[in-house]
Amino acid sequence: MTTRRTGLREQKKQATRVALREAALRLALKRGPDNVRVDDIAEAAGVSPRTYNNYFSSREQAIVAAVTAERESRVAASVAARPADVRLADALAEAILEQYTEPRDHDELLLITASPALRDTFLDTVAAIEHPLAAAIDQRLGHTGTPTARVLAASVAAAVRIALQQWLQPPAAPLTTSGLVVPSGSLPDLLRSALATLEPALDAAEEQAQQRLRQ
């Protein structure tokens, strides 16, 4: 019975989180992010501002959460779903490219690129892939009991953040009169280039895991 109560409680919390982030995005698209208050989001989701603060620390965090929509879990699941004979570096690159370059709603992308605060928050969310990705990498390496998977996951997250930063905040990014940053370059190419720098470390970790299995 306790397990069932815990499951129902978690489902309710997740439903509240989804309601808040969807309300935040809906209001931001309608009014512009600068014209949305936390109280507005809470009211639209049918909860109190205090409840809102249990889930998100800012309006930007809620808006970006709606745009990314559990991406960290999807990246890890995608890595775990790759066949065992697929090279680890390839499995990671395929999963990252799949989840970060999927077709986006034009209005949502415009919302992110038009706001410096939303751009920064969007980049900060990349760190959320570390924990689930470390678990997926550790599973593929055969549960080594070492920090290897965590170090690799942190490195992948850093590479993804740098690629996104280059895409969203290039040094000479053209600006519109409203301050809108126009993304430049190919995001898939930027991601591939950043992740390629990690291939030697990923290959070495995978080779060590295979050697342990052969012993």
Predicted regions and their residues:
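Basic, helix-initiating cap at the start of DNA-binding domains
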Residues: 1-31, 35-44, 74
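HTH DNA-binding helix-turn interface
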Residues: 7, 31-33, 46, 53-64
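Amphipathic alpha-helical segments enriched in hydrophobic/aromatic and basic residues
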Residues: 28, 37, 59-67, 71, ...
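Short secondary-structure transition hinges
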Residues: 73, 103-132, 138
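Short, well-structured alpha-helical segments
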Residues: 93, 149-157, 161, 188
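C-terminal peripheral helix-coil segments that are non-catalytic and often amphipathic
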Residues: 135, 169-215
